[in-house]
Amino acid sequence: MATDTTEVKAIARFIRMSPYKVRRVLDQIRGLSYREALIILEFMPYRATEPVLTLLRSAAANAEHNAGLDRAELVITQAYADQGPVLKRFQPRAQGRAYQIRKPTCHITLAVAANAGAK
């Protein structure tokens, strides 16, 4: 009764981008097959697609090399972006003042598994 689903993860840490902007992209590919996600990411107009696309290819390579799974049968099971440390910088302003600039980072996690009902 127990199903043996091998889930393979890939994590990109300290990506210099807001997690909110990355989540907008991840929400579009969660639950899709590997090929569908590749096509969608190629044509999305957001800057966040670049690290997500790299990470998706890495997760597929991990699944193929470490678990012996076929790329054509992979499905994205988990996709989330956690907040990383915030780099704090200062912007000099008039009359000796300085404004704080926050440069957010995020940790992106993608998990793929073989599709149970592969065609």
Swiss-Prot record:
One of its GO terms (biological process) is translation. The keyword Ribonucleoprotein applies. Pfam families: Ribosomal_L22 (PF00237). One of its GO terms (cellular component) is cytosolic large ribosomal subunit. One of its GO terms (molecular function) is rRNA binding. Keywords: Ribonucleoprotein, Ribosomal protein, RNA-binding, rRNA-binding. Gene3D superfamilies: Ribosomal protein L22/L17 (3.90.470.10). It comes from the Bacteria. Belongs to the universal ribosomal protein uL22 family. This protein binds specifically to 23S rRNA; its binding is stimulated by other ribosomal proteins, e.g. L4, L17, and L20. It is important during the early stages of 50S assembly. It makes multiple contacts with different domains of the 23S rRNA in the assembled 50S subunit and ribosome. Part of the 50S ribosomal subunit. This is Large ribosomal subunit protein uL22. It comes from Nostoc sp. (strain PCC 7120 / SAG 25.82 / UTEX 2576). The gene is rplV.
